Design a protein with these regions (language model features):
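Interdomain "pre-motor" coupling segment immediately N-terminal to P-loop NTPase/helicase cores
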Residues: 43-99
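Conserved C-terminal "switch" segment of AAA+ ATPases
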Residues: 90, 260-266, 277-342
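Pre-Walker A (pre-P-loop) alpha-helix and adjacent loop at the N terminus of AAA/AAA+ ATPase modules
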Residues: 95-141
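Walker A/P-loop
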Residues: 133-168, 197, 265
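AAA+/P-loop NTPase substrate/partner-engagement loops
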Residues: 158-188, 195, 215, 284
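Conserved alpha-helical scaffold flanking the Walker A/P-loop in AAA+ ATPase domains
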Residues: 183-207, 238-245
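C-terminal engagement/docking regions of AAA+ P-loop ATPases
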Residues: 338-369
Length: 369
């Protein structure tokens, strides 16, 4: 019996030691690992698709060699760029793009609906195989000068892709999209292959401005645009200069128009139309500030708006965004040229002098100059 009591005492004491150790470890503050950093999660691999097939680019190279040296110059660099990465291009990161678009919604209230439509497409595109990635084309409809083209550029920025603008009203013909054949005197590649060749993305943004001004006598500009808007035909889009087909079906196409009455019906049937209202004063003020911030970053100087003057100008709804942009840039340039601390711009009509203050701008560490 005495031996059993001694064994029991040992077991109890050992248990107490284990409990004490466990309790002290639980209550102790976590120790920092010196010289070690928590490894960052690996970024998701970029999704890649074939845009320019190797066989097609090889045939295009043969076509190029048969041209005169003068005509060959126009396409040699573009073909070299198209063949980069074996003709493959990356797709936008749909999650990151959707997050960026969400931020844009806070600054561009008049783009809420088209942004939400793009976000819907991005959610679906992310869940599908890379080959199925598509963003449906949209038409931004609104009065002249409300910033439709500017806003389309902001969408490209959110997607992290380059953009190109073509004016449909001034289009001389289909060759602006699909290139002109080598038999033409001024033969050159089209805007579509140029955009994809120079881009690392399979989904750059193509803005076709003023589609309500397309004329039927413009050498078949409309049929080529319709081919580009249809995913099936866009997969085999042909550039006449290179006599080459390539996959343009993932280009994000944004059309703009001032009046829906003059937009060709076949085009309307292929896009979703969004009415873009004129931006309110608060949004206009943010656009002005964005223009100033961009100029500040590029020049190393900043012009700070005199608050009351900037608000007065933002409230002038009769001054469209094109005029607003010109006025802000002019005020910035005048301030830099004069070296004054305050620059004033006299605007036409009833708008009085608009004041800006100039200060040297030193970018914070880590920011580009």
């Amino acid at each position: 019996l005495e031996g059993s009591e001694q064994e029991l005492t040992k077991v109890v004491q050992a248990a107490k030691r284990h409990w004490s150790t466990a309790l002290s470890m639980a209550l102790a503050p976590p120790q920092k690992t010196v010289g070690r950093k928590k490894p960052r999660p690996e970024p998701a691999p970029a999704r890649v698709v074939q845009v320019f097939g190797p066989d097609n680019t090889e045939k295009a190279a043969e076509t190029l060699r048969e041209m005169s040296s003068e005509k060959r110059t126009a396409g040699a660099r573009i073909l070299e760029q198209a063949r980069a990465g074996d003709g493959c291009r990356t797709l936008p990161d749909a999650r990151e793009a959707s997050k960026n678009l969400e931020a844009k919604k806070l600054h561009f209230e008049n783009l809420q609906q088209p942004i939400e439509r793009l976000q819907t497409d991005l959610v679906l595109a992310q869940a599908m195989p890379a080959q199925e990635f598509r963003i449906a084309p949209i038409l931004l409809l609104g009065e002249p000068g409300i910033g439709k083209t500017y806003l389309a550029g902001q969408l490209a920025q959110a997607l992290g892709v380059p953009s190109e603008k073509i004016s449909a009203g001034g289009a001389q013909g289909a060759f602006q999209l699909s290139g002109s054949h080598s038999t033409w005197t001024s033969a050159k590649p089209g805007a579509v292959i140029n955009l994809l060749a120079q881009s690392a993305s399979a989904s750059p943004v193509l803005v076709v401005d003023e589609v309500d001004k397309i004329h039927e006598d413009k050498h078949a500009f409309l049929p080529v645009l319709l081919d580009l808007l249809d995913a099936g035909t866009a997969q085999r889009f042909r550039d006449e200069y290179f006599e080459m087909e390539f996959d343009a079906s993932r280009i994000v196409i944004v059309l703009t128009a001032n009046s829906i009455d003059k937009v060709p019906q076949p085009l309307l049937s292929r896009v979703e139309v969004f009415k873009v209202p004129a931006p309110e004063p608060a949004q206009r003020l943010r656009i002005m500030q964005k223009i100033m911030a961009d100029l500040s970053e590029k020049t190393g100087h900043a012009i700070a708006f005199a608050p009351e003057a900037a608000e007065r100008l933002a409230d002038r709804m009769d001054v469209d965004l094109r005029q607003l942009d010109r006025m802000v840039r002019a005020a910035f340039a005048m301030a830099l040229q004069a070296g004054d601390k305050v620059a004033r711009l006299k605007t036409p009509g009833a708008i009085g002098p608009v004041g800006f203050s100039l200060r040297d701008w030193a970018p914070q560490q880590g920011q580009p100059c």
